[in-house]
Regions:
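Short, amphipathic alpha-helical interaction segments positioned at domain boundaries
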Residues: 65-93
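Membrane-inserting effector segments that mediate pore formation, membrane fusion
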Residues: 85-109
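Short amphipathic alpha-helical interface segments
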Residues: 2-31
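Basic amphipathic alpha-helical segments that dock to polyanions
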Residues: 39-51
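A short, conserved structural fragment
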Residues: 48-60
């Protein structure tokens, strides 16, 4: 699967916008972001790999329960939060190669 930076950004927004520290986000609650659940799971796994989220992530089940963003997740989201910055960042990425690591995206933004 290919990494979808827009989906990653949208998942981070969804986690940030969850209203309660006691309520975790599940795959079902994220399903409005994309109809392909396998793609959603894959991107949650990537966010977990990057250390941007805290939760129960079981790739074998598969099961997810995202409790919150990490400090690093907040920092990344703050860097790409503004829509005009995000649009410019994606434009720059398109000129370079079309894809990049999350750290490179943060640096460009």
């Amino acid at each position: 699967m290919k990494r979808n930076l827009d989906l990653i950004r949208n998942i981070l927004f969804a986690v940030e916008n969850s209203n309660s520290i006691d309520a975790s986000l599940t795959l079902n609650s994220l399903s409005k972001l994309h109809r392909n659940q396998d793609l959603l799971l894959y991107h949650v796994f990537l966010l977990d790999d990057a250390g941007f989220i805290i939760g129960i992530i079981d790739e074998s089940a598969p099961y997810i329960s995202i409790a919150r963003l990490t400090n690093e997740g907040h920092d990344y989201l703050d860097t790409i939060r503004d829509d005009s910055v995000w649009k410019q960042t994606k434009s720059t990425l398109g000129k370079i190669s079309g894809s990049a690591s999350l750290e490179v995206v943060k640096t460009i933004a």
